[in-house]
């Protein structure tokens, strides 16, 4: 699925509002090579301890497949270029496919909250 320009702007605004700690949002609206996804994908990043030499970069990616959206939490690089994963890169969480970006966003937030509860000592 590819998005029109006005839909891209709306999608960016939606994910920026849903995940305000993530920055440097970017997107692609086409297949650029065999190692990338077809269709529309957008991603933002959050850096844990950015002052460190080997800071860890977490990415949220929302990707389309056919007429559906899915959400992904990765570390090291965003889901869009996942076929070129390197040492230290990890695929952490995924959602199922949803009809809307909003539904995929809500589902990814729920998966992140579930992971945080599991890791919490409180």
Describe the role of every protein-language-model region:
Residues 111-121:
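Short arginine-rich
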Residues 49-103:
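Intrinsically disordered, low-complexity regulatory segments enriched in Ser/Thr/Pro
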Residues 100-112:
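A short, charged, amphipathic alpha-helix used as a generic interaction element across diverse proteins
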Residues 1-57, 121:
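Negatively charged, low-complexity tracts enriched in Asp/Glu with abundant Ser/Thr
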């Amino acid at each position: 699925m590819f998005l029109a320009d006005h839909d891209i702007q709306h999608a960016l605004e939606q994910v920026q509002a849903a995940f305000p700690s993530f920055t440097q949002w970017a997107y692609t609206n086409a297949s650029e090579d065999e190692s990338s996804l077809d269709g529309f994908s957008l991603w933002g990043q959050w850096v844990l301890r950015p002052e460190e030499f080997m800071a860890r970069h977490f990415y949220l990616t929302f990707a389309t497949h056919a007429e559906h959206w899915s959400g992904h939490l990765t570390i090291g690089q965003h889901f869009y270029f996942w076929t070129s994963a390197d040492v230290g890169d990890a695929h952490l969480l995924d959602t199922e496919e949803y009809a809307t970006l909003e539904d995929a966003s809500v589902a990814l937030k729920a998966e992140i909250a579930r992971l945080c509860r599991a890791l919490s000592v409180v």
